[in-house]
Amino acid sequence: MKVRASVKKMCDNCRVIKRKGKVMVICSNAKHKQRQG
């Protein structure tokens, strides 16, 4: 899980979602998981 000020899609499988007010990226590639903070 990467924590970044700006989260971006890193590939076509990445999905930008909101969970509990936090912007997150979920992906089939675990290295692409990100959370805003």
From Swiss-Prot:
<comment type="similarity">
    <text>Belongs to the bacterial ribosomal protein bL36 family.</text>
</comment>
<dbReference type="GO" id="GO:1990904">
    <property type="term" value="C:ribonucleoprotein complex"/>
</dbReference>
<keyword id="KW-0934">Plastid</keyword>
<protein>
    <recommendedName>
        <fullName>Large ribosomal subunit protein bL36c</fullName>
    </recommendedName>
</protein>
<keyword id="KW-0687">Ribonucleoprotein</keyword>
<dbReference type="InterPro" id="IPR000473">
    <property type="entry name" value="Ribosomal_bL36"/>
</dbReference>
<keyword id="KW-0689">Ribosomal protein</keyword>
<dbReference type="GO" id="GO:0009507">
    <property type="term" value="C:chloroplast"/>
</dbReference>
<keyword id="KW-0150">Chloroplast</keyword>
<dbReference type="Pfam" id="PF00444">
    <property type="entry name" value="Ribosomal_L36"/>
</dbReference>
<dbReference type="GO" id="GO:0003735">
    <property type="term" value="F:structural constituent of ribosome"/>
</dbReference>
<dbReference type="GO" id="GO:0006412">
    <property type="term" value="P:translation"/>
</dbReference>
<dbReference type="InterPro" id="IPR035977">
    <property type="entry name" value="Ribosomal_bL36_sp"/>
</dbReference>
<dbReference type="GO" id="GO:0005840">
    <property type="term" value="C:ribosome"/>
</dbReference>
